[in-house]
């Protein structure tokens, strides 16, 4: 099995690569072009929606273009998200986080387009999920990994399961489901 660590490998990132989605996209694209005729499993993790909250400029202003404060979304600003923060600063930090989500969404779209370009959409199961959400003082706390509130665990799970490999039963549900059951089922498809 070929594997590689993307995003957190300093040798691949270079010195000034704050936004990892372009690098991830390029490396995944190269891998898919080399391997698209073989059966494959690929796990792609877009890291950009993790701290710092500093999306590229066009996304930084997307949800809060009138902000005049000093918060830029860097770690020092993130550390100041605590009770007592000014409402406009908190709104701006949430807007930066949302900007990062929108930025990564663009790269998920590029992955979809690449799968389509390589004629893989009709025989590839594609699962899009978030590893966690983020709490922004909804319960007087910030970050993730410390509670089980909806802000942290109510995350997207989108499954593209094409007709070519779909079994006899097919349904859509908005109920909670178990990854313990979903992953073995999908890997047998």
Across the structure, where does each feature detected by a protein language model lie?
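Catalytic domains that recognize anionic headgroups
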Residues: 1-189
């Amino acid at each position: 099995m070929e594997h590689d660590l993307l995003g957190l490998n300093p040798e691949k990132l270079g010195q000034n690569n704050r936004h990892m989605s372009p690098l991830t996209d390029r490396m995944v694209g190269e891998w898919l072009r080399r391997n698209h005729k073989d059966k494959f499993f690929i796990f792609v993790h877009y890291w950009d929606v993790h701290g710092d909250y500093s999306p590229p400029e066009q996304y930084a202003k997307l949800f809060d273009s009138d902000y005049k404060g000093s918060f830029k979304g860097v770690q020092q600003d993130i550390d100041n998200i605590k009770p007592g923060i000014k409402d406009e600063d908190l709104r701006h930090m949430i807007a930066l986080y949302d900007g990062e989500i929108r930025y990564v969404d663009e790269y998920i779209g590029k992955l979809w387009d690449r799968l389509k370009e390589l004629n893989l959409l009709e025989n590839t199961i594609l699962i899009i999920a978030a590893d966690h959400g983020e709490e922004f003082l909804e319960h007087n706390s910030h970050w993730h990994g410390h509670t089980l509130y909806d802000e942290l665990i109510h995350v997207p799970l989108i499954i593209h399961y094409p007709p070519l490999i779909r079994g006899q039963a097919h349904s859509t549900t908005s109920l909670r489901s178990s990854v313990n059951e979903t992953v073995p089922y999908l890997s047998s498809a």
